[in-house]
Amino acid sequence: MNIAMTGATGYIGKHLSNYLTEKGGHRIIPLGRAMFREGMSGLLVQTLTHCDVIINLAGAPINQRWTPEHKQELFNSRITVTHRIIRALNAVKTKPKLMISASAVGYYPSLVESDEYTQTRGDGFLSDLCYAWEKEAKRCPQPTRLVITRFGVVLSPDGGAMQQMLRPLRATKVAAVIGPGTQPFPWIDIRDLCRAMAFFIENEELRGVFNLVAPQAVSQSTFTRAMGKAYHAWTTLIVPQTVFRLLYGEAASFLTAGQSVRPTRLLEAGFHFSVPTIEKLFEAVSYTHLTLPTK
């Protein structure tokens, strides 16, 4: 299949592009930033005309201080890009079979167990951002099938969130728990994320919202201690929330308040996680060059 992808050069996009190309035999068509500038709508329409699937991963990094300017960038890089994809799809005569649009578990309330059937959403900027992002994606025209994926923290030692956590651990041999440590830490291994995306492409009956998180729910402390053990940390320290609030301001809530999320619909659909637990995640800490299973 021809698969158009925003965010193809990002951490998730690179892994997913390689997986879908090498394991699925698909052709990836990157949709770069230039294609979403004003006056480029014709080129976007022309590109989507030849695509079977669209995967929308676009979005500026969330894990930095949320200044008014960065909040606007977070909004524009997600909602504005999604809006222009939908506008282009409405102009395409032969619609793609599937659109997969990313979101995040930040949609849900903090500290309350949630799944795709949960009716309430969280409070604050992150939940509002996810809500607006998904609302725009839901304007996807028929007959294109729409899947919305709410990502947890995506993990692999070669990049992303884990690389940021490993950098100070390797330098100091101290595993730092983000206080209080009891907050949920919803996570998914990059290999399972890639397999889940292929699962959506292959199973045409699947549509709607899916949580992309591992079935094992852990706290921030449990995860950090397991990581410290795997990477031979000398000790584990709890860093007070106030430190992160000073560093990140409002964005500290991304680290200090977590969502307890279950992948209920994915499990109901028959998806089997290759990395369902943190014990499995840290079994082989040297998988910098990932071996992605075919199924």
Question: What is the predicted function of each stretch?
Answer:
Residues 4-19:
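N-terminal Rossmann NAD(P)H-binding glycine-rich loop of SDR-like oxidoreductase domains
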Residues 35-84:
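NAD(P)H-binding glycine-rich loop region in Rossmannoid oxidoreductase-like domains
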Residues 76, 111-148:
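Catalytic helix-loop patch of NAD(P)-dependent Rossmann-fold dehydrogenases
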Residues 83-124:
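Conserved Rossmann-fold NAD(P)-dependent oxidoreductase catalytic core, especially the SDR/UDP-sugar
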Residues 124, 131, 141, 145-148, ...:
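NAD(P)-dependent short-chain dehydrogenase/reductase
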Residues 166-175, 183-217:
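Alpha-helical substrate-binding/gating segment
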Residues 203-250, 283-286:
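Mid/C-terminal beta-alpha module of Rossmann-like enzyme folds, strongest
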Residues 288-294:
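Conserved small/polar residues in nucleotide/adenosyl-binding loops
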